[in-house]
Amino acid sequence: VLHGGMEFSDSCIINDDVIKAIEKCIPLGPLHNPANLMGIRACQAVMPNTPQVAVFDTAFHMTMPPKAYRYAIPTEYFKNDDIRRYGFHGTSHKYVARRTAELVGKKEFKMVNCHLGNGSSLSAIKDGKCMDTSMGLSPLAGVPMGTRSGDIDACVVQFICNKYGMSVDDCLTMLNKKSGMLALSGVSSDFRDLNDGAEAGNEDCQLALDKFAYEVAKYVGAYAAALNGIDVLTFTAGVGENDCVVRQMVCDYLGFLGVELDPELNKSRGKEMVISTPNSKVQVWVVPTNEELMIAQDTAELVNAAKQ
């Protein structure tokens, strides 16, 4: 389920109360939650005696402190409407945090996870718990993505709507579906196409890659400050796991943290491995995400516990 709002901080077995709470979150996830509910109800109709588990994309981020999740807007919008930072890709961030703890052999450490794909988000994680994340009330916030603008001055929306007679909904559709790498490059939202274009001398493709790496590195730097240093930097998802050019571009900004990539190790694609040098003050890992496994594990734990 995309959006658990402030109702859910963990996965849970679905019952009537859970369904009502998911319905309550529809204003926060208007595109996804209704579809999620359709699936839940269809399964209830076909398999009425089979337990169902809801795994929320926002749940992992519910450990953020107020200084990270509150927006500096009048308090009534938070109290009445639950407007705050929620974050997404939580199932992926949770999996990578757990798997990285196994790989480095300890539970207490500070890391930044870079989930980089067509949709991208970063999370600051301390001892396995999320302290901050780049997406916000919606997945539109944070770094620029395949077709999403990422962080943008709200007055841009006002300006475009006023000048071009565009509705707010249409403007948000533009920011979600026609912006990001697609808009900057004028070519594609696919990073493989951007790399090919940049190699062929397309300056707009190069700008898109430069902008992406720059913004990702800015978030890593900000989260290093928020965590008072980091021990591990992880890359995951389609771009993070497979695009050695983007990883190198991001890490080129992070020398001040003591990040040092091994150029040969960084050539790997889709493999679970360290790609930093032995001298790097921050371990840099590629950790392929496995959201399906995380969902299956949560489901098994809850269903087995319910049987006891």
Go through each PLM region and give its residues:
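General beta-strand structural signal in soluble alpha/beta enzymes
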Residues: 30-34, 51-56, 62, 112-114, ...
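Glycine-rich phosphate-binding loop of actin/hexokinase-like ATP-binding domains
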Residues: 63-163
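Catalytic phosphate/nucleotide-handling subdomain of diverse soluble enzymes
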Residues: 126, 131-167, 173, 237-268
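Adenine-nucleotide phosphate-binding core of ATP-dependent small-molecule kinases
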Residues: 173, 180-184, 191-226
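Internal helix-turn-beta structural module
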Residues: 206, 210-230, 240-307
